[in-house]
């Protein structure tokens, strides 16, 4: 952990080490060649400037790939401020390169929870020409933390007592303390923010779930675009990205041979599918746990055993949570696991594993092995290794998904930002998805890079199917 992040005199950035900028720039240059979707969008929209002067806050992993996204948003006119959406996911050389280029960025690997939420606040804080503090007009969110902070702050200014209610977690306590401080230091701030805020595009399953929950209660403050459920995001980033990055995280963290190990993957959605296939590709024997009969049947038809966590205790060598739910691996599970077990998470939040309960377990001994690898000696004498403190193992212990697959996701994010701004007076306060035509276009932008040549329908074939020669080729209800 870097406990003394570097800042600029004008609060332009707060990062680990500005001297890493040259290294970061070299890797950004490499990534650009692997991100044809984003680079094509730059070329298409650079002269049109569809986001000219628009204040955009990003709360998304500050990686090399995200740096390419940030510079794409800037190239099409946006005024950008950025923070990471995870305390461990920042690549410090990427943050340094972005800071050097003039973008305000507040992120470093190994933030405390207090630092993390303060960075989110700084990314949300813009200063107008007259010195007035205001917020973004658009948000690029990943997990929904920036969206959550604005909603909770606005509700506090409108009579909510949530900040005085008992907290379910340490992180919730941190959020409440921050909101109380802002209420004193910046009275009426969140109302000003909401008055200017026009929309949010959400990157991940967990954040989308939050949006639908808020929308169902009628409390959603702005239109939102669900980027996660674009086919070129969920079926690529979530599936193929995890298929490569999970094993990378495990290998870098533990230097362990996966072949022959018994691994349990909790959840068989798109992330779970990618994770299960990642482990099996290395020769691990994989068991899947599921609550959904459809996903369970899919796993079984792929040749995976489907059991419960309880059935695997004392047998499995590795546990990976992928669900987006809470309390998937509980303290009673961890104390019953075999000696030398590895436990990690590749879902968005750390509450999939009862990390707080493990840290406070009577008689437990915690030993830090290296950054993001902790050894717990349990009261029964067994050892458990927890990776990335229960947060995203692929970003905490490795570098996340490869650039090519992230080009799909970030092309969707950029198109969503353009769509939100162009239709800010049209969209209602609800959750939307990008049209299938744009989904197909994102895929099309990536084909040449990998040597794909599409077959073209004849006019007669298109008429027979009842579609256009140019697409869309599938109905909205089609399951890819």
From Swiss-Prot:
Q: Which Gene3D superfamilies does the entry link to? A: Adenosylhomocysteinase-like (3.40.50.1480), NAD(P)-binding Rossmann-like Domain (3.40.50.720)
**Catalytic reactions on record:** S-adenosyl-L-homocysteine + H2O = L-homocysteine + adenosine
Q: Which GO terms describe its cellular component?
A: cytosol
Q: Which cofactor does it need?
A: NAD(+)
Could you tell me what the cofactor note in this record states?
Answer: Binds 1 NAD(+) per subunit.
Residues making up the signal peptide according to the UniProt record: none
Q: What is this protein called?
A: Adenosylhomocysteinase
Highest taxon of the source?
A: Bacteria
The record ties this protein, via Pfam families, to: AdoHcyase (PF05221), AdoHcyase_NAD (PF00670)
Task: List the GO molecular function terms.
Answer: adenosylhomocysteinase activity
Q: Which GO terms describe its biological process?
A: L-homocysteine biosynthetic process; one-carbon metabolic process; S-adenosylmethionine cycle
What NCBIfam families does this protein map onto?
ahcY, PRK05476.2-3
Top class in the EC scheme: hydrolase
Query: Keywords assigned by UniProt?
Result: Cytoplasm, Hydrolase, NAD, One-carbon metabolism
Pathway field: Amino-acid biosynthesis; L-homocysteine biosynthesis; L-homocysteine from S-adenosyl-L-homocysteine: step 1/1
What does this protein's UniProt record list under function?
Answer: May play a key role in the regulation of the intracellular concentration of adenosylhomocysteine.
> What Enzyme Commission number does this protein have?
3.13.2.1
Family annotation (InterPro entries): Adenosylhomocyst_ase-like_sf, Adenosylhomocysteinase-like, Ado_hCys_hydrolase_NAD-bd, NAD(P)-bd_dom_sf, S-Ado-L-homoCys_hydrolase_CS
Matching entries from SUPFAM superfamilies are given as: Formate/glycerate dehydrogenase catalytic domain-like, NAD(P)-binding Rossmann-fold domains
Entry's localization field: Cytoplasm
- For NAD(+), which residues are the binding ones? 204-206, 238, 267-272, 290, 325, 346-348, 394
UniProt-annotated binding residues for substrate: 63, 142, 203, 233, 237
Q: Which family does it belong to?
A: Belongs to the adenosylhomocysteinase family.
Protein species of origin: Xylella fastidiosa (strain M12)
């Amino acid at each position: 952990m870097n406990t003394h992040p570097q800042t600029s005199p004008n609060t332009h950035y707060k990062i680990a080490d500005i001297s890493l900028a040259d290294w970061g720039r070299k890797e950004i240059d490499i990534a650009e060649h692997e991100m044809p979707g984003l680079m094509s969008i730059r070329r298409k929209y650079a002269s049109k400037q569809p986001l000219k002067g628009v204040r955009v806050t990003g709360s998304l992993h500050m990686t090399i790939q995200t740096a390419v996204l940030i510079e794409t948003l800037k190239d099409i006119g946006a005024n950008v401020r950025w923070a990471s959406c995870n305390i461990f996911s920042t690549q410090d050389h990427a943050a340094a390169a972005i800071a050097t280029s003039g973008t305000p960025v507040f992120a470093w690997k190994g933030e405390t929870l207090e630092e993390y939420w303060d960075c989110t606040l700084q990314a949300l804080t813009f200063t107008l020409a007259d010195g007035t503090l205001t917020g973004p007009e658009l948000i690029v969110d990943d997990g929904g933390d920036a969206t959550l902070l604005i909603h909770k702050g606005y509700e506090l200014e409108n009579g909510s007592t949530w900040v005085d209610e008992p907290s379910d977690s340490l992180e919730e306590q941190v959020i409440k303390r921050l909101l109380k401080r802002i209420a004193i230091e910046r009275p009426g701030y969140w109302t000003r923010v909401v008055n200017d805020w026009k929309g949010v595009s959400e990157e991940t399953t967990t954040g989308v779930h939050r949006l639908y929950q808020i929308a169902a209660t009628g409390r959603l403050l702005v239109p939102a675009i669900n980027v996660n459920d674009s086919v070129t995001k969920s079926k690529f980033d979530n599936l193929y990205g995890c298929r490569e990055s999970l094993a990378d995280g495990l290998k870098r963290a533990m230097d362990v041979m996966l072949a022959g190990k018994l691994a349990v993957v909790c959840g068989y959605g798109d992330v779970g599918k990618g994770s299960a296939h990642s482990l099996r590709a290395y020769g691990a024997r994989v068991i899947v746990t599921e609550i959904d009969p459809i996903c369970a049947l899919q796993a079984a038809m792929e040749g995976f055993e489907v059991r419960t966590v309880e059935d695997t205790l004392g047998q499995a060598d590795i546990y990976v949570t992928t669900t987006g739910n809470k309390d998937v691996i509980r303290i009673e599970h961890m104390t019953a696991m075999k000696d030398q077990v590895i436990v990690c998470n590749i879902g968005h939040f750390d509450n999939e594993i009862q990390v707080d309960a493990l840290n406070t377990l009577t008689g437990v001994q915690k030993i830090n092995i290296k950054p993001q690898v902790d050894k717990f000696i349990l009261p029964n004498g067994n050892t458990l290794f927890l990776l990335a403190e229960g947060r995203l193992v692929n970003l905490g212990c490795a570098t996340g998904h490869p650039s090519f697959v992230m080009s799909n996701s970030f092309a969707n994010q950029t198109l969503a930002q353009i769509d939100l701004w162009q239709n800010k007076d049209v969209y209602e306060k609800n959750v939307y998805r990008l049209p299938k035509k744009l989904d197909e276009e994102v895929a099309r932008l990536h084909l040449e890079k990998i040597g794909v040549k599409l077959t073209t329908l004849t006019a007669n074939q298109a008429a027979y199917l009842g579609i256009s020669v140019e697409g869309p080729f599938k109905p909205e209800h089609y399951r890819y």
